[in-house]
């Protein structure tokens, strides 16, 4: 398929739960700063909100690998990872990634994925999407946080996603609504 932008987007959206537009706005300087500070800062998320994602060892290793990759290709700190510019480049990159997903998802998507049901979780969508990677990130982060500290799990996941209500985070976790389940 030959699309390095797609590989980069997959890696970062899966590892950090970024929205596709946040990925398209990510600059090399954000990665360099994350290595110094231990947090990836998303300065302009949904609704203009800033959020910080504390790096775990796997995320740190991913950033190290990509900083080396981009520096070897001559990117400067202020350069976008996959977009050409702020004005039109972010929109163009986002549209290009969305189109790629639309035309290629059948090549790597599990057949009949909407029929795979995990106990305690909602039914999956029939197709995958970039936003679906964000759901996967949420579920992995939540499971890891549960191991660490049950009480902090919801807070950690909600903060990393840039949401302040657990009700919204529950959607990403594919949890059934406890009120509906009781009925």
Regions found by a protein language model. Give the residues of each.
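Residue-level marker of regulatory loop/turn positions in helix-turn-helix DNA-binding domains and
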Residues: 1-2, 12, 122, 126, ...
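Conserved tyrosine-mediated DNA breakage-rejoining catalytic core shared by Y-recombinases
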Residues: 25-68
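Basic, Lys/Arg- and aromatic-enriched nucleic-acid-binding interface segment
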Residues: 1-16, 20
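Active-site/catalytic core of tyrosine-dependent DNA strand-transfer enzymes
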Residues: 58-125, 131, 137, 142
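Alpha-helix N-cap/helix-start motif at helix boundaries, enriched for small hydrophobics
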Residues: 9-10, 21-26, 157
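Active-site-proximal segment of tyrosine recombinases
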Residues: 23, 128, 138-141, 145-162
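Catalytic-site neighborhood detector that most strongly recognizes the C-terminal catalytic loop/helix
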Residues: 161-183
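Short, cationic motifs built from Arg/Lys/His that form the positively charged side of catalytic pockets
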Residues: 5, 18-19, 46, 51, ...
